[in-house]
């Protein structure tokens, strides 16, 4: 079976309402300004970064990493088609915010721990790493049967990883972002 490309391009994940809601939540978690440096791991098309860049009038183009090279990616970001560990290990840039969105479950446990460790060393003073993942216990994403099975496996993996992170890192805090998805037939 061929991989699903652009599956989310016209869904709620790409809607202005979702992006605005997410960025409002994000800006309550961390103080950013026009001089902030932002890295987004799993940026997709860069729509969240694009909106954030506009809101903050960023002087430094945010950097977005993704393993898919989307045709319709934002022009307001520096997009790199590369895996996160490779990029973060080599970059000399430090960041005020490192976002890891819906990607941590794609890594093996050791890779995820290594990525977080390297990311911590790439933060400016007062910088933050924010990991976005679905709540394994409270989500109601409508999916077809095979996708639902894979989603549940990913969510269980995320939950184990978050428990491991919280056990080993006293600086991590969990905050909940919720967004009500309205789907009509």
Name every feature range the model reports, one short phrase each.
Residues 99:
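A conserved beta-strand element that flanks and buttresses the S-adenosyl-L-methionine
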Residues 37, 127-128:
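Short glycine-centered segments of the SAM/dcSAM-binding site in methyltransferase folds
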């Amino acid at each position: 079976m061929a991989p699903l490309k652009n599956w989310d391009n016209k869904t709620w994940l790409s809607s202005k309402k979702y992006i605005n809601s997410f960025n409002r939540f994000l800006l309550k978690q961390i103080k950013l300004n026009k001089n902030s440096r932002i890295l987004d791991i799993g940026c997709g098309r860069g729509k969240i970064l694009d909106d954030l860049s506009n809101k903050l009038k960023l002087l430094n183009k945010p950097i977005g990493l993704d393993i898919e090279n989307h045709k319709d990616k934002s022009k307001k970001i520096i997009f790199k088609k590369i895996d996160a560990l490779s990029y973060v290990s080599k970059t000399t840039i430090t960041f005020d915010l490192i976002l890891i969105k819906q990607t941590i479950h794609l890594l093996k446990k050791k890779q995820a721990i290594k990525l977080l460790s390297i990311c911590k060393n790439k933060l400016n003073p007062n910088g933050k790493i924010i990991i976005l993942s679905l709540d394994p216990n409270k989500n109601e994403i409508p999916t077809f049967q095979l996708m639902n099975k894979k989603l549940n496996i990913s969510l269980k993996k995320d939950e184990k990883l978050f428990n491991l992170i919280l056990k080993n890192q006293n600086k991590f805090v969990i905050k909940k972002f919720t967004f009500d998805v309205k789907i009509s037939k």
